[in-house]
């Protein structure tokens, strides 16, 4: 028996006393450490993409815009290429590079390694107010982000570029019921519902999320891709011929090339199945045949193909194995500073993007419009939200229709001038205005 009578104190009272004594420690030590470590006086947002930051323009636009709005921006992704100088010099933006893992040991091992790395990154940056992630990719980042936002005070924003499961579905010959595709769909469908806000690149994608995923439409804002300020048309006073002699491009211009009549085309690609560059190469072969057999007045075409990807080697071989006369194809990998310089020097942009989901729009078309380039693009239904036939571009369904569009574009000056005017009108639609409108609609910022 205790001298002080402590033995008579009930257990529940001991527990109450322990909780009482521990509360200050939890409130002033544990909670700040868990949720406020590194807390900024500014509103803080983590923007993350499982992709190369230097070639993720929309993510970089988000970073610039949030910084301009007064946010402290934590920008995370792969650093495989140069990041624009203005991003590096921005005091409101801090970059957190992620290590890139290959899939040599299988997709599961890759996902596990990525997951551990992401958990470490989220823990380090646990005091953020918002998390914005690009989707796709969905796995493993979306489930992890949902867990983080559930146990912290961060609000989750998903920026929908496409649907992750549809990209995986293409790899399995459009078999939706393939176990991996079905799993990817369920992960996307389930975890998307936990996000606080959603941004989509088209109205069609917003409709899909509402009707198929059951997401509240009030949580979704359409934010069309728009070109950044670095994309701008040539001015009338600019000397295009002199600009084509810049170091990054001069060596690719043939000596016999006449810029007064010959045409420069450009396309950017990630050399993936949803963007069949062989269609463009096939149309150029038909163009060569047309020159040889029917029309020796056809102008020369110089086409720049920029980008990297899994099918690149196959396409390069197709070009190397053909004997070209009227067409010259060059493969480039440009810095984020040189790419806009190239676009404004071209006559036409080409897009082979078809969309695995049929719900997204190619960013490259917006960059081309921003540079005053009319576009020739592979048609699919949602493209009507951006490109109007014979107004700001030309559409095609296969390589023969693309060949016809090439002939129109290089031979019919009236067509060229009409769609050029349309592209110049589109060049006035800019990112900042669209971004402010969408984020204000969701009440993330206040104009």
From Swiss-Prot:
It is an enzyme of class 2 (transferase). One of its GO terms (molecular function) is chitobiosyldiphosphodolichol beta-mannosyltransferase activity. Coiled coil: none annotated. GO terms for biological process: dolichol-linked oligosaccharide biosynthetic process. Residues 128-148 dip into the membrane without crossing it. Pathway: Protein modification; protein glycosylation. The chain crosses the membrane at residues 9-29. It is found in: Endoplasmic reticulum membrane. SUPFAM superfamilies: UDP-Glycosyltransferase/glycogen phosphorylase. One of its GO terms (cellular component) is cytoplasmic side of endoplasmic reticulum membrane. Residues 30-127 are cytoplasmic. It catalyses: an N,N'-diacetylchitobiosyl-diphospho-di-trans,poly-cis-dolichol + GDP-alpha-D-mannose = a beta-D-Man-(1->4)-beta-D-GlcNAc-(1->4)-alpha-D-GlcNAc-diphospho-di-trans,poly-cis-dolichol + GDP + H(+). It is a single-pass membrane protein. Keywords: Endoplasmic reticulum, Glycosyltransferase, Membrane, Signal-anchor, Transferase, Transmembrane, Transmembrane helix. Residues 1-8, 149-447 are lumenal. Its EC number is 2.4.1.142. Belongs to the glycosyltransferase group 1 family. PANTHER family: BETA1,4 MANNOSYLTRANSFERASE (PTHR13036), CHITOBIOSYLDIPHOSPHODOLICHOL BETA-MANNOSYLTRANSFERASE (PTHR13036:SF0). Participates in the formation of the lipid-linked precursor oligosaccharide for N-glycosylation. Involved in assembling the dolichol-pyrophosphate-GlcNAc(2)-Man(5) intermediate on the cytoplasmic surface of the ER. This is Chitobiosyldiphosphodolichol beta-mannosyltransferase. The gene is ALG1.
